[in-house]
């Protein structure tokens, strides 16, 4: 079954009572696609990143069988960034910073090759 995921491929900075990261790859579309790759022959993603997004991560997507034809890379722009702090229970969090960057003008384009996807 072929699926399409539309959403964020981003950078996150996360603080918990147990540790802190400054800039890691995040975003719903990232983790939906990576998770689906374990059960699906060909997840397809639609998102946008800036020129600061690591080529190694795009290569990882491809290595895992994720179709990245719908991933727009905007030269001269920065990737969406979110920063948050999770509380002791890990169920609640506060957003510390949101920088829309490329997401502000994102116009999702569905490639023709995605037209036969089931979901």
Predicted regions and their residues:
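Short catalytic helix/loop segments, enriched in acidic residues and glycine
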Residues: 19-34
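Extreme N-terminal starter segment of soluble prokaryotic enzymes
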Residues: 1-4
